[in-house]
Swiss-Prot record:
Residues 166-237 form a coiled coil. It comes from the Viruses. Keywords: Coiled coil, Host cytoplasm, Host-virus interaction, RNA-binding, Translation regulation. The lineage of its organism: Viruses, Riboviria, Orthornavirae, Duplornaviricota, Resentoviricetes. Residues 208-313 are annotated as: Interaction with host EIF4G1. InterPro entries: NSP3_N_rotavirus (IPR042519), NSP3_sf (IPR036082), Rotavirus_NSP3 (IPR002873). Its main location: host cell. GO terms for cellular component: host cell cytoplasm. Belongs to the rotavirus NSP3 family. This is Non-structural protein 3. Homodimer. Interacts (via the coiled-coil region) with host ZC3H7B (via LD motif). Interacts with host EIF4G1. Residues 150-206 are annotated as: Dimerization. It holds the Pfam family Rota_NSP3.
């Protein structure tokens, strides 16, 4: 099975692209402000700051860790993803996250960034118009959600001062804002649908991998059962062979010492491990052949001393 690390590679590519985007944003901002700069110096400073922030905040390790978890799941290792799921649904985790959010709010308040500033910053963003001193104020998704929930009110104490020359068409502005909201909603829905499709594909791949693992495990279990049966059959056969040899040995007219020696060798055969048993059989056969060879040499010497000859028939 091939090892998949596509998610980690994608996460690393996104981080590298973010750094390049940060460099481009920094240099373009300096150009718009008419400030001369050294590109290599800007590149080095942005890289140093970017690497420090990504490492010190833990964002890089967090992204790479989640990517590694997804790759492990695609490779059939689900323990890390299960731990992450349990961690995200644990009440202690939720409590710890709430505590971190509260700490960040306290830190922002201590830096002079009050609730009003935080809310306005989360609801609006400012887009600079190139070549002009004016800018465009854009509403974020949070602002859209607040409008839909009825959490935006008009201050009645505000006195609108109309100018005779420049009159603002609020209806057209509202229609324009509504069209932007619809466009943003469509883009969000498209991204959400794309993520749903990707999640379904990942889920299908995980199910397919689980089926393959189940089939392989079933095949391994069958092989294990067959191996155990074969081992028991060999152990039984070895025991019956030893018993047969012992019975045949007792029927021979050999001396008791020889019988005892052969029985000791038979009793030393390993009944549990068939591989060791075959090695023991080989050793016994070698000893028997060696004994037969010595007897034949002795018999041959006696014939020669008695001036007899021998032939094989």
């Amino acid at each position: 099975m091939l090892k998949m690390e596509s998610t980690q590679q994608m996460a690393s590519s996104i981080i590298n692209s973010s750094f390049e985007a940060a460099v481009v944003a920094a240099t373009s901002t300096l150009e718009l402000m008419g400030i001369q700069y050294d590109y290599n110096e800007v590149y080095t400073r942005v890289k140093s700051k970017f690497d420090f922030v990504m490492d010190d905040s833990g964002v890089k390790n967090n992204l790479m860790g989640k990517a590694a978890t997804i790759d492990q799941a695609l490779n059939g290792k689900f323990s890390s993803s299960i731990r992450n799921r349990n961690w995200m649904t644990d009440s202690k985790t939720v409590s710890r996250l709430d505590e971190d959010v509260n700490k960040l709010r306290l830190l922002l308040s201590s830096k002079g960034i009050d609730q009003k500033m935080r809310v306005l910053n989360a609801c609006f963003s400012v887009k600079r118009v190139p070549g002009k001193s004016s800018s465009v104020i854009k509403c974020t998704r949070l602002m859209k959600e607040k409008i839909e929930r009825g959490e935006v009110e008009v201050d009645d104490t505000f006195v609108e001062e109309r100018m005779e020359i420049d009159t603002i068409d609020w209806k057209s502005r509202y229609d324009q804002l509504e069209r932007r909201f619809e466009s943003l909603k469509q883009r969000v829905n498209e991204k959400y649908n794309n993520w749903v499709i990707k999640a379904r594909k990942v889920n299908e791949n995980m199910n397919s991998l689980q089926n393959v693992i189940s089939q392989q495990q079933a095949h391994i279990n069958e092989l294990q059962i067959y191996n155990n049966k074969l081992e028991r059959d060999l152990q039984s056969k070895i025991g019956s062979v030893i018993s047969s040899i012992e019975w045949y040995l007792r029927s021979m007219e050999l001396s008791d010492d020889i019988k005892s020696d052969i029985e000791q060798q038979l009793n030393s055969i390993d009944h549990i491990n068939p591989v060791n048993a075959f090695d023991d059989f080989e050793s016994i056969l070698r000893n028997l052949i060696s004994d037969y060879d010595r007897i034949f040499i002795m018999f041959k010497g006696l014939l020669q001393q008695s001036n007899y000859t021998y032939t094989y028939e």
